[in-house]
């Protein structure tokens, strides 16, 4: 009898341990998915995410918390910190179609800032652990999925640093097959394409590469029809485009190039960007909003829209008052959902700062005037925007 009671107790303990294991934190699974033992995602019946709600419902609620608040959310307790760091909420947001736009910009060597247009909130990113050469050299930036890629130059070579919104830290990542600067770039979901630019020896490139954020690897693509530097890139209607730039120190490129991801071929579009680039000028400032292409003509401070059918540009209206740019350098012109953002310097009675202006193309233009709205102001950072990227995820 004693042996039987002891055996029953062992079975009870084993069952209890099994139940406890099935109720443990399994944050690497999506809602509704099961692990190898058939356990659904849960954070424990006795340790629920939000008291009074089943875990799946609670996780759906937390998925709507703005991503700019994740650092605060992760400080609530160890459970929330583990949930945030697992990346489960990031995946769940994608499933639910939740998109929040975050702006990353740098205005001085002190470091990067993050701005939430939705919350009108500025935040300081952790300091990038790069060397001083990279910190002070010219850089280019690109947002891919939930990563910010920063391209620059160290003492003897090009380098790429990556900031992960998920881990909230910087890491040095794999370089391109053909390292370069002054290139065209654009991103679509979890991929990005870079094309053209200049290598370490000053050679102007026609090569292009594709970056996959899921693997962190670069893949060579077919060459463009012509080499070019100081050019701009963007995705529109699911295809990648390159416009502007120079094929030699004195020759501007006026035709555009379109890359089809399915056929893996480039197509020339004659006269797509007839403006003549100069060596001292910035690359074309372009954005795509709702698959419509816009450019900021910094010589006239006018916003223009591209007519895909006529292959022509039409004037929409004027920029808001701002500090004059230096041949287009120091300005940022970026898309943000259905809005178009301009980051420019202003001087006022309280000093210098950066003003974020927005315009919705759907509102149109009235007598050449665009309805600009101020989204935010960052004071005491100078009037020059060195780099800027917008992340939507």
UniProtKB/Swiss-Prot annotation:
UniProt key word Repeat: yes
Gene3D superfamilies: Kelch-type beta propeller
Keywords, comma-separated and alphabetical: Kelch repeat, Repeat
Kelch repeat placement: 88-142, 144-190, 191-238, 240-286, 288-336
GO cellular component, one term: nucleus
InterPro entries per record: F-box-like_dom_sf, F-box/Kelch-repeat, F-box_dom, Kelch-typ_b-propeller, Kelch_1
SMART domains: Kelch
The keyword Repeat belongs to this UniProt entry's keyword annotation: yes
Chain ranges of the F-box domain: 48-95
PANTHER family: F-BOX DOMAIN-CONTAINING PROTEIN, GALACTOSE OXIDASE/KELCH REPEAT PROTEIN-RELATED
Protein name: F-box/kelch-repeat protein At5g60570
């Amino acid at each position: 009898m004693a042996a039987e009671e002891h055996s029953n107790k062992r079975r009870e303990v084993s069952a209890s341990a099994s139940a406890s294991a099935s109720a443990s934190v399994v944050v690497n699974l999506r809602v509704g998915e099961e692990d190898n033992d058939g356990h659904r995602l849960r954070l424990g019946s006795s340790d629920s995410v939000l008291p009074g709600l089943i875990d799946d419902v609670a996780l759906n609620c937390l998925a709507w918390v703005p991503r700019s608040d994740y650092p605060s959310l992760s400080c609530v307790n160890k459970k929330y910190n583990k949930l945030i760091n697992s990346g489960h909420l990031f995946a769940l947001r994608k499933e639910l179609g939740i998109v929040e736009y975050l702006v990353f910009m740098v205005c001085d060597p002190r470091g990067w800032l993050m701005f939430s247009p939705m919350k009108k909130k500025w935040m300081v990113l952790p300091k990038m652990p790069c060397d001083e050469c990279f910190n002070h050299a010219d850089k280019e930036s690109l947002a891919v999925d939930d990563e910010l890629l920063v391209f620059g130059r160290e003492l003897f070579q090009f380098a790429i640093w990556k900031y992960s919104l998920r881990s909230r830290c910087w890491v040095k990542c794999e370089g391109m097959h053909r390292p370069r600067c002054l290139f065209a770039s654009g991103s679509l979901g979890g991929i990005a394409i870079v094309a053209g630019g200049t290598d370490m020896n000053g050679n102007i490139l026609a090569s292009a590469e594709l970056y996959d954020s899921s693997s962190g690897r670069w893949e060579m693509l077919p060459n463009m029809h012509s080499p070019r530097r100081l050019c701009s890139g963007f995705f529109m209607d699911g295809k990648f485009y390159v416009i502007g730039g120079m094929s030699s120190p004195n020759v501007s490129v006026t035709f555009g190039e379109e890359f089809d991801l399915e056929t893996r071929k480039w197509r020339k579009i004659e006269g797509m960007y007839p403006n003549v680039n100069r060596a001292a000028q910035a690359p074309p400032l372009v954005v795509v909003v709702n698959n419509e292409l816009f450019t900021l003509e910094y010589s006239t401070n006018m916003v223009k829209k591209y007519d895909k059918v006529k292959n022509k540009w039409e004037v929409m209206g004027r920029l808001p008052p701002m500090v004059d740019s230096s041949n287009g350098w120091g300005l940022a012109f970026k898309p943000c959902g259905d809005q178009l953002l301009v980051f420019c310097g202003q001087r006022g009675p309280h000093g210098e700062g950066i003003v974020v202006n927005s315009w919705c193309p759907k509102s149109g233009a009235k007598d050449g005037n665009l309805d600009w709205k101020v989204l935010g102001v960052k004071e005491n950072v100078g009037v020059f925007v060195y780099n800027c990227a917008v992340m939507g995820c």
